[in-house]
Swiss-Prot record:
It comes from Arabidopsis thaliana. Keywords: Endoplasmic reticulum, Glycoprotein, Glycosyltransferase, Membrane, Transferase, Transmembrane, Transmembrane helix. Glycans are attached at N238. The lineage of its organism: Eukaryota, Viridiplantae, Streptophyta, Embryophyta, Tracheophyta. Required for pollen tube (PT) growth and integrity by affecting the stability of the pollen-specific ANX1 and ANX2 proteins. Involved in protein N-glycosylation in the endoplasmic reticulum (ER), especially in the female gametophyte. Mediates PT reception in synergids through protein glycosylation. It is an enzyme of class 2 (transferase). This is UDP-glycosyltransferase TURAN. GO terms for biological process: pollen tube development; pollen tube reception; protein glycosylation. Belongs to the glycosyltransferase group 1 family. Glycosyltransferase 33 subfamily.
Amino acid sequence: MGKRGRACVVVLGDLGRSPRMQYHALSLARQASFQVDIVAYGGSIPHEAVLNHPSIHIHTMAQPRFIQYFPKILYPVTLLLKAFIQFTMLLWFLFVKVPAPDIFLVQNPPSVPTLIAVKWASSWRRAAFVVDWHNFGYTLLALSLGRNNLLVSLYRWSENHYGKMATGSLCVTKAMQHELDQNWGVRAKVLYDQPPEFFRPALLEERHELFCRVRKDLCHPIGVYDFISRELENQELNETLFTTKFNADISLKQNRPALVVSSTSWTPDENFGILLEAAVMYDRRVAARSKGSETAEISEEQHHYPNLLFIITGKGPEKEMYEEKIKRLNLRHVAFRTMWLAAEDYPLLLGSADLGVCLHTSSSGLDLPMKVVDMFGCGLPVCSVSYSCIQELVKDGKNGLLFSSSSELADQLLILFKGFPGNCDALMSLKAGAMETGSSGRWATEWEDCAKPLITQVVSQIADS
């Protein structure tokens, strides 16, 4: 495909935290037979499938970290200086360091200075220019500066102006496709996020090995000594919090805690406080019901509410603030752990969990959380914050539940985990729905049907011009 047989994927961010662009690179190499150059920042380690593919070449840019030490009063000046440094660096990589490609595929946002640099490079090197719209960059900037700020207006103009210059466009939802078409003059093709093949339910052996590997992370509570700490102190070598190994046989513990996973970027568009408030409500209600059940004539299995372990993955600016809040909660039936997992272990964690929680609300209201797609790939049902287009992904009552407040989330936790692990029909029903959703589509198929025809078209268009 193409005269040069080469594609360049541009991510002005941490490649390891940009899974969709990693999947694009893999598909360009596997399904379109391109040599693929990725220009991105370093930081987190990408998936081993990307690192080990002989046709994928990663070019790592250095981040202008010194800017973070500027005083906050100079924030607008800092933004402009950072954009100028990034622009200069991008021009060097895209004009000089990377071999000339047939196509540049760029993630948006960030829009400034990425779209300008890639547009210039595509014109200079006679390559197609495709934008993958994940969200709108100006809406993210507006979270910190406000919608009426002059810089936000300039950012939106630049995003619109250069976005319209693309040879082709992809986007993540039908709602975003409609917005781009009606208000931006951009004709985009929807490429839904779909889980790749390594997101699947974990085998018992994989669960046991995973929890052996993360035992050190689980041993360290956030602040107070909790039920997880007590349980781990008394464990035998052949057991984990969730599994027991006897000779070669591995089984799930009947008295295990329920495992709830949430992945967050610890940013203002994800209100983590909702989850903390719901955890407090669950803890208090379970404590009260446990006390009442001492005299009530109700079977233990029917009345049982498990302890909950929330494992929160991700990196971001508000992590320490929320960890301080967790330290002050002093919960008896709920525990929290924060961790950052290897790219190969994250799917195993999702495939071992009982429930996922998504707090993503979207700065634009037009994108969908990829973390939920990954959860469905692992057959994991999700409780998600409700917003304008989330119904394109989460079908309330079928593969997950939608909530708008912490009290709604607390109610959902009580409903889903009543009778856990053996007598929780509501949870099992959602799990079946999540399995069905996850198995109905995979990234390679979606990319072949939606992205590949567009890429073939724009590459041919440039080659013939």
